[in-house]
Amino acid sequence: MIEEGAVADKAQAWVYTEDFIPLSNALLQAHQTASELGVPRVSTGTGTALRMLAAVSGARAVLEIGTGTGVSGLWLLDGMAAGGVLTTIDCESELLPHARRAFRGAGVPSHRTRLIAGWALDVLPRMATGGYDMIVLDGDIA
C-alpha cells in the first residue's frame, strides 16, 4: 500500500526535476507555442533522455515521427553529432512552420533539418531503408 505522503512527495519530486534543467530560449518559445496551440510536447525529463540517447549513440541521422512545435526535435538536435540531420514527419502540416521557427531560433542551420508533412505510414515506405541511426515515435502514424 502506498502512503498518501509518498504520492505527494513523488509529485513534488517530478515538479523539481522538470524545473531543475534550464531551458534555452528556443525551447521555452517552442513550449509556449505548444501550450498556446494545445499541442502535446515531451516533458523536460523526456527531452533530456532523448538528448542523451542521441549523444551516446553518436546519431548523425535521426527520424522523428511527430514534429509538433519542435520541442523534441530541439532536444534531439542538441544531442546529435555535429552536422547530423533530423528528418521529422507530422500529419499536421500547419505545425511545421512553428517547428521550423523553433529550429531557426535555436541557430540550427536549415540543412540540418528536413520537415515532411504527411502521415508516417504514407511517408515511411519512401524513406531510405537503414538510413537512420535513431528513430523516435512521438506522434500519430496513421
Task: Name what the model sees in each region.
Residues E36, P40, T44-A142:
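S-adenosylmethionine/decaboxylated-SAM
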Residues M1-P22:
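N-terminal auxiliary segments of SAM/dcSAM-dependent transferases
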